[in-house]
Amino acid sequence: VNIISSIAKNDINSTSYSLCMDICSPTFRKLIAEKNVDVIYADPPYTAQQYSRFYHIPEVLHSYKYPKLQMFRGKYTQGIYPEEKYKSPFCSKIKAKGAFEFIFDMAQNHDCSLIVSYSESKKEKTGNERMVTLEYLLQLAHKKLPHHSLSKINFDFDYRQLNRGDKIVENKDDKEILLVFK
């Protein structure tokens, strides 16, 4: 989750720190409570696939921890899975709704704009079910942000997993969209 605030624009440490943290942590809540937030941009995982393995370099730069890498069949895993990898609540059917509610609550509490990146799933083609539906996000916005208008921006490119070329499903139609609430 990316937080853009009038203060954080000039405070590199606060901005980079907020980008790498668990959005539900007490430290993040304290950090965001002390800022004047203009826009919240959320590009969370939509599926059970963990994104944390693809953010290894920013995590090392931020925390200066060198994780022990995971081995599978005698080789290091792709995407760098640290042994104690972070698991996003957005990747869990049980926790995803609560994580989205937290983001919408932040937008409501700060009376700021919210931009959510999303991709609808055509499950029968990809088998990659989303943790929450677009309908759920729109209902949540109606409940939490009743005075915000909605702009839905459709992109002409598909959501793509970071897979080897021979693992990519070519016939899917999972278009990326932005939901802009302001």
Task: Go through each PLM region and give its residues.
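Structural motif
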Residues: Y41-D43, I115, V180
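A short acidic (Asp/Glu
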Residues: R29-K35, Q50-P58, K125-L134, L162-R164
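Mobile active-site "lid"/loop adjacent to the S-adenosyl-L-methionine
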Residues: A48-K95
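Conserved Class I SAM-dependent methyltransferase catalytic core
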Residues: E84-S149
